[in-house]
C-alpha cells in the first residue's frame, strides 16, 4: 500500500463541482492499493500517516507529526500509484488491486483513520475528482507499507 503525502496549508476534493472533502493545515494523502495489500498493511500505513514527523517544531525542524499538531487528514484514492513505469512508454497497472479489493481496503483505512484521528476527510473512490491544494514547503514523501 502506498501513500503519497503532501504537507498542505489547506486542500479540498471536488466531484462534479461539489466539495466532498476538505481540510485546513495537515496532510493530503493519495492512496494506492496493490494486489497483495491487506488490512495489516493498511494499519501500518495509517500509523505512519499519523506519526510521521513532517511538521516543523519551534526551530523549524521536522519533529512534529499530524497527531502532534492536530491537523487534518485528507485521504484520496489513486490507483495510478500502483503503476509499473519501469519499461515502455505506457504505465502498466497489473500490480494495482482489483477495484472491489481496492475499495474495501480504502474504506477500511478510512474507517480506522476516523477511529484514531479527530479530523479526517476523503475523496470518493473511483470518481473523477479535482484536487485543490496549497502545498506547504513543498513537503512530499512516498510512504509504503
From Swiss-Prot:
Residue numbers covered by motif Gly-cisPro motif, important for rejection of L-amino acids: 137-138
Matches recorded under InterPro entries: Daa-tRNA_deacyls_DTD, DTD-like_sf
Pfam family, one: Tyr_Deacylase
Known catalytic reactions: glycyl-tRNA(Ala) + H2O = tRNA(Ala) + glycine + H(+); a D-aminoacyl-tRNA + H2O = a tRNA + a D-alpha-amino acid + H(+)
Subcellular location: Cytoplasm
GO cellular component labels: cytoplasm
Gene3D superfamilies tied to this protein: D-tyrosyl-tRNA(Tyr) deacylase
EC number: 3.1.1.96
GO biological process terms on file: D-amino acid catabolic process
Domain of life: Bacteria
tRNA-binding keyword on record: yes
Subunit structure: Homodimer.
UniProt note: domains: A Gly-cisPro motif from one monomer fits into the active site of the other monomer to allow specific chiral rejection of L-amino acids.
Family of the protein in this entry: Belongs to the DTD family.
Chain's role: An aminoacyl-tRNA editing enzyme that deacylates mischarged D-aminoacyl-tRNAs. Also deacylates mischarged glycyl-tRNA(Ala), protecting cells against glycine mischarging by AlaRS. Acts via tRNA-based rather than protein-based catalysis; rejects L-amino acids rather than detecting D-amino acids in the active site. By recycling D-aminoacyl-tRNA to D-amino acids and free tRNA molecules, this enzyme counteracts the toxicity associated with the formation of D-aminoacyl-tRNA entities in vivo and helps enforce protein L-homochirality.
Name this polypeptide is given: D-aminoacyl-tRNA deacylase
Lineage of the organism: Bacteria, Pseudomonadati, Pseudomonadota, Gammaproteobacteria, Pseudomonadales
Amino acid at each position: 500500500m502506498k501513500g503519497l503525502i503532501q504537507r498542505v496549508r489547506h486542500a479540498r476534493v471536488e466531484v462534479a463541482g461539489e466539495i466532498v472533502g476538505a481540510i485546513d493545515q495537515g496532510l493530503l494523502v493519495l492512496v494506492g492499493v496493490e494486489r497483495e495489500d491487506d488490512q495489516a498493511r493498511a494499519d501500518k500505513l495509517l500509523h505512519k500517516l499519523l506519526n510521521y514527523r513532517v511538521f516543523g517544531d519551534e526551530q523549524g525542524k521536522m519533529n512534529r507529526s499530524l497527531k502532534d499538531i492536530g491537523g487534518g487528514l485528507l485521504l484520496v484514492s489513486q490507483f495510478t500509484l500502483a503503476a509499473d513505469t519501469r519499461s515502455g512508454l505506457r504505465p502498466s497497472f497489473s500490480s494495482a488491486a482489483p477495484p472491489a479489493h481496492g475499495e474495501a481496503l480504502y474504506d477500511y483505512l478510512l474507517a480506522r483513520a476516523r477511529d484514531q484521528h479527530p479530523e479526517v476527510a476523503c475523496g470518493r473512490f473511483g470518481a473523477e475528482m479535482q484536487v485543490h491544494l496549497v502545498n506547504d514547503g513543498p513537503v512530499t514523501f512516498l510512504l509504503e507499507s
